[in-house]
Swiss-Prot record:
GO terms for cellular component: primosome complex. The gene is dnaT. Involved in the restart of stalled replication forks, which reloads the replicative helicase on sites other than the origin of replication. Can function in multiple replication restart pathways. Displaces ssDNA from a PriB-ssDNA complex. Probably forms a spiral filament on ssDNA. Keywords: DNA replication, DNA-binding, Primosome. It comes from Escherichia coli O7:K1 (strain IAI39 / ExPEC). The keyword DNA-binding applies. This is Replication restart protein DnaT. One of its GO terms (biological process) is DNA replication, synthesis of primer.
Amino acid sequence: MSSRVLTPDVVGIDALVHDHQTVLAKAEGGVVAVFANNAPAFYAITPARLAELLALEEKLARPGSDVALDDQLYQEPQTAPVAVPMGKFAMYPDWQPDADFIRLAALWGVALREPVTAEELASFIAYWQAEGKVFHHVQWQQKLARSLQIGRASNGGLPKRDVNTVSEPDSQIPPGFRG
């Protein structure tokens, strides 16, 4: 087990117990690493050094300027989880599968390696919103699992090609043809 000792002064626990005042007085920075069984156990620190460190911590905790920014700028708005309607319902824009969707899909015989992406979910919701059909929440999840299984397997598991890329012909001549 590796460890990092944060002071050059090292002493055994027995020496510290025997005469702690002398050990701390000889410590270069007011701090001593105490070892027990050939491994660092804790640090012993003088009251003066502790006061210095606490003052430094307090100074660093204060802002460097008197300009304060509104905390709302840094916090993402928390959206309340949408309650799933009871019984059958038509697909709606904020519908989400359960948090353990991948596990449930496996129970239904659909092995999904990756969670549903935002694009896949948006496509699924848009399609079924237009259809206007009504199903239970579990049935919607089963439909999503099957849709993902079919959509991801349609290209042999490879990502879909970008239709905007220019293809590059190869320069290989198949056997039996002259070049």
